[in-house]
């Protein structure tokens, strides 16, 4: 019986500071045992429990795409005991990854569709996974137009800045990068909240699905915009956060109504969420 | 032999032994198995490992704390690790070996046995299997004692169980006064009775008396609590019902209901370190506690007491019903009714929720 | 007792009708014998729900901290002293409260009664001035009320509310010949090893449900020390050292603030008498500072106030 609480040991390969306040770091993990990497077959949208012995575990969305082989990427915000300990670790340190957990963005349904990605702040991690996945040469032609609206408070708070710029230069993906405010004169992209930019750029809802990930306040104001653009609730997809411990639907703490966010989610359509209590 | 249409398991011929021999039975079982039975401790009865057969006391209608700790201990060390960064074991978790010899829980009530079956759906799923729960389930024999006199706060018959229900038991004992009838439900139960040297057959008169006791016990439980409409109720309508405000006031979020309840399973996982050694331990937790759903960011979806009280009853009487189609997550043992310090009565919630028009 | 019920109902209805308060906190009849349920009513016609008897042991002050409304609350002697401390600690303002004071002759210890019945289930319990009459299947018992009071009520010396806006009855005589610290003195006589063993056994059954903490009107910290993670003060499992730490530290946090309302012991599902820890500290506070919790709204608890003539050197 495989013990679902036992993490795979991984080594920290690199640590990249993502944001100017240094509270977000991207960790690159390499499996100690190659067989574990084979077992860790995942899809964009899933998460894993990162385990730091002596401190605990935290559920973090997988930022790398399944097309990126040999390592895993996670972008972690420093908020508490475990994340602080993780931030203080160095390349070469050993920790654990348990997963992949949860469901994923509905890739089978998204085939042949246009995909509109709306992300805010550091919830962008699984969206990065999704974009890298779709842009991969093996996958790109399976999807229609890809539009991305991504914003942070300031330019320094954007994640994956170099990749964002690289995607911006491509012609097979339309990028709308925005910040809430900036005094930087060299900033050449949008200035404005994500919901506003979404409204202004008005991505078409025809044959399109929207993937929305961000802080609750962003989601709250973006959803009406998308609805107004003609996206029905079944075609608006979001990924939720909850306090989690076991990550496998057993400890009982992450439920929204009948659904465990760690096992039946974290990806839900708006149509599904409207059937559940608004308790998240 | 006849087949009980409810479970399709052939019910084997009933055995019987003299009540006066009960202590000997227990002592014989003790030689072979780790034996647990209810033991009186001052004003309450709880399961303890028996040092000798005469410690057992079956006079209480049920134990104060449920027997769920047999399958789901309150504190369980999952893994051990060293924190010395220089060691080659740094950051590696090792599963802690558990000593799980064959155990017998003697005198468990039918409601508590059914509770294990309900909690099975949480810990033993197609996708994930909890090794600690499963190993304990597999190594524990349940010798049940039918309830001749259910108490007034019992309502097992309302929730798919009953004072003589064999669900989940390996043996069902019925106390006839001078004799005890032992009905074997599984091969394991048969093995345990063999080791206890219980081989005598129950007479027809005994069987008749057991049936009469069963009928009397079921009759004494009175009318059933309403549950038939819970499934069809609209989830959000129940969630937003106006009665929660009144229900929640008295609650002090103390967690007693959760800890005494045989169908509550929520747990927390903690790492504890002492010097250079540590363990990852899981402990019982309760949705009653304010920090149960507290995010690292500070956001808490259930920061109000009303939300937490509502979660308890919505989970037990609605979410579990919808999700697993096995009825409510309650076996009618009545412990929460007896132990809630402010007399929040789940039986009232059955009525409020089932009869809600909205 | 009926007279009390009538008075409480009348007061509640009057206060709500005249819009003197937004809500009334009291008790309603319980669903099982010897229990009652705290209830909050907002309308005068709900006044009929209110009830009073010797099973109203819960401390309604537990529901007050940080509420914003104008509240009428039914308070016994101990409850009123907790309210005094809550006012001093800025958890509720005096102006918000209308205290319906209840001179109390002690609450019944339900578990003691159940113990005396030896497994026979009570189906109905009624009381006279001096007796409890208990009826069950095939039996009736008459028990002397004074023998079945909650432990704290048996030694109570402040039965009358100290702070109130109206009383529902004449004050009752206070007990004077009680030694509140008889059991504490017994423990004080033990050697250190004996005491360690004693407390290990006392706290052994604890299942860390925190009902004692939650039932306590003085435990209102937004994040209790047991729930802190940065730093984490103690482990959360049932390890005996952690359990002992929890009880000792909680008792210290209550020193000079506990009124011995008995709620902690009453709610404990495994019947632990943790009040012995609190009474030891109550004795210390009384001996060192001459202070009894919550007697007067003019007096601050000694551990939250500083006087230049305080004995400790490190203050200076």
Each language-model region and where it sits:
Chain B
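Iron-sulfur-associated redox domains of electron-transfer enzymes in respiratory
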Residues: 1-234
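Ferredoxin-type iron-sulfur electron-transfer modules in oxidoreductases and energy-metabolism complexes
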Residues: 227-249, 267-358
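General structural feature for long, well-ordered alpha-helical segments within catalytic domains
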Residues: 21-25, 257, 283, 345
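Active-site-flanking alpha-helical
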Residues: 116, 262-266, 341
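Short, well-structured alpha-helical interface segments that form or flank functional binding sites
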Residues: 106, 242, 246-252, 256-259
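Oxyanion-binding "anion nests"
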Residues: 229-234, 254-262
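Histidine- and/or cysteine-centered catalytic micro-motif in compact active-site loops
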Residues: 187, 256, 262-269, 292
């Amino acid at each position: 019986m495989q013990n679902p609480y036992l993490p795979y040991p991984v080594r920290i390969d690199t640590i990249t500071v993502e944001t100017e306040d240094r509270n977000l770091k991207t960790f690159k993990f390499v499996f100690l045992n190659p067989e574990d990497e084979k077992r860790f077959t995942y899809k964009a949208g899933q998460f894993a429990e990162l385990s730091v012995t002596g401190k605990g575990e935290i559920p973090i969305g997988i930022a790398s795409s399944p097309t990126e082989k040999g390592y895993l990427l996670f972008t972690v915000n420093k908020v508490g005991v475990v994340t602080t300990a993780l931030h203080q670790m160095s390349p070469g340190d050993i920790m654990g990854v348990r997963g992949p957990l949860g469901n994923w963005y509905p890739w089978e349904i998204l085939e042949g569709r246009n995909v509109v990605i709306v992300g805010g702040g550091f919830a962008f991690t699984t969206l990065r996974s999704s974009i890298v996945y779709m842009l991969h040469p093996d996958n790109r032609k399976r999807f229609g137009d890809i539009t991305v609206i991504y914003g942070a408070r300031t330019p320094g708070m954007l994640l994956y800045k170099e990749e964002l710029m690289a995607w911006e230069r491509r012609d097979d993906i339309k990028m709308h990068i925005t910040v809430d405010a900036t005094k930087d004169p060299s900033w050449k992209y949008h200035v404005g909240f994500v919901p506003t930019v979404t409204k202004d750029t008005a991505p078409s809802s025809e044959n399109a699905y929207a993937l929305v990930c961000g802080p609750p306040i962003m989601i709250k104001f973006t959803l009406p915009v998308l609805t107004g653009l003609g996206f029905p609730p079944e075609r608006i997809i979001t990924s939720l956060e909850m306090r989690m411990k076991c990550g496998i639907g057993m400890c009982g703490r992450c439920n929204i109504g009948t659904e465990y966010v760690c096992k039946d989610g974290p990806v839900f359509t708006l149509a599904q969420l409207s059937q559940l209590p608004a308790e998240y | 032999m006849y087949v009980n249409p409810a479970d399709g398991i052939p019910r084997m011929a009933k055995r019987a032994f003299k009540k006066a021999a009960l202590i000997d039975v227990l002592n014989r079982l003790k030689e072979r198995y780790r034996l647990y039975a209810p033991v009186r401790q001052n004003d309450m009865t709880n399961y303890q490992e028996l040092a000798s057969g005469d410690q057992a006391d079956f006079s209480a209608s049920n134990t104060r704390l449920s027997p769920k700790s047999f399958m789901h201990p309150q504190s369980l060390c999952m893994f051990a690790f060293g924190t010395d960064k220089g060691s080659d074991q740094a950051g590696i978790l090792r599963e802690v070996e558990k000593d799980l010899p064959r155990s017998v829980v003697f005198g468990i009530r039918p409601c508590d046995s059914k509770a294990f079956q309900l909690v099975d759906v949480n810990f033993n799923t197609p996708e994930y299997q909890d090794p600690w729960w499963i190993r304990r389930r597999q190594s524990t024999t349940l010798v049940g004692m039918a309830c001749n006199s259910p108490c007034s706060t019992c309502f097992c018959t309302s929730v798919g169980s009953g004072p003589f229900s064999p669900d989940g038991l390996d043996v069902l004992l019925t106390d006839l006064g001078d004799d005890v009838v032992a009905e074997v439900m599984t091969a394991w139960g048969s093995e345990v009775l063999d080791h206890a040297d219980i081989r005598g057959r129950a007479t027809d008169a005994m069987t008749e008396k057991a049936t009469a006791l069963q009928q009397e016990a079921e009759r004494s439980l009175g009318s059933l609590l309403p549950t038939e409409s819970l499934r069809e109720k609209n989830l959000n309508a129940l969630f937003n019902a106006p009665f929660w405000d009144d229900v929640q006031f008295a609650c002090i979020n103390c967690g007693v209901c959760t800890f005494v309840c045989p169908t509550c399973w929520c747990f927390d996982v903690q790492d504890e370190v002492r010097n250079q050694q540590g363990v990852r331990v899981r402990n019982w937790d309760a949705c009653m506690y304010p920090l149960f759903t507290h995010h690292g960011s500070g956001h808490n979806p259930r920061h109000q007491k009303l939300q937490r009280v509502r979660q308890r009853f919505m989970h037990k009487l609605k979410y579990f019903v919808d999700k697993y189609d096995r009825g409510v997550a309650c076996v009618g043992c009545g412990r929460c009714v007896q132990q809630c310090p402010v007399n929040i009565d789940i039986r009232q919630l059955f009525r409020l929720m089932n009869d809600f028009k909205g | 007792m009926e007279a009390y019920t009538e008075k409480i109902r009348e007061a509640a209805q009057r206060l709500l009708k005249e819009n003197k308060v937004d809500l009334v906190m009291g008790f309603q009849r319980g669903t099982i014998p010897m229990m009652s349920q705290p209830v909050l009513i907002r309308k005068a016609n709900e006044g009929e729900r209110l009830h009073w008897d010797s099973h109203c042991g819960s401390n309604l002050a537990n529901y007050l901290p940080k509420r914003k409304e104008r509240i009428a609350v039914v308070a016994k002697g101990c409850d009123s002293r907790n309210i005094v401390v809550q006012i001093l600690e800025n958890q509720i303002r005096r102006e918000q409260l209308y205290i319906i004071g209840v001179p109390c002759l002690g609450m019944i210890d339900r578990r003691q009664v159940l113990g005396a019945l030896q497994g026979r289930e009570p189906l109905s319990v009624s009381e006279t001035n001096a007796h409890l009459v208990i009826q069950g299947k095939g039996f009736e018992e008459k028990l002397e009320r004074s023998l079945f009071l909650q432990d704290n009520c048996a030694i109570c010396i402040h039965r009358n509310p100290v702070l109130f806006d109206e009383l529902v009855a004449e004050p009752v005589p206070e007990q004077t010949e009680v030694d509140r610290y008889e059991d504490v003195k017994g423990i004080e006589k033990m050697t250190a090893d004996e005491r360690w063993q004693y407390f290990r056994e006392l706290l052994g059954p604890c299942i860390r449900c925190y009902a004692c903490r939650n039932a306590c009107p003085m435990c209102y910290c937004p994040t209790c020390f047991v729930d802190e993670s940065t730093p984490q003060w103690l482990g959360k499992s049932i390890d005996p050292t952690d359990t002992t730490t929890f009880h000792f530290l909680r008792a210290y946090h209550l020193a000079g603030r506990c009124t011995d309302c008995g709620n902690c012991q009453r709610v404990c599902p495994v019947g632990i008498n943790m009040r012995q820890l609190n009474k030891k500290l109550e004795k210390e506070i009384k001996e060192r500072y001459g202070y009894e919790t919550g007697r007067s709204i003019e007096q601050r608890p000694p551990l939250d106030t500083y006087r230049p003539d305080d004995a400790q050197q490190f203050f200076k």
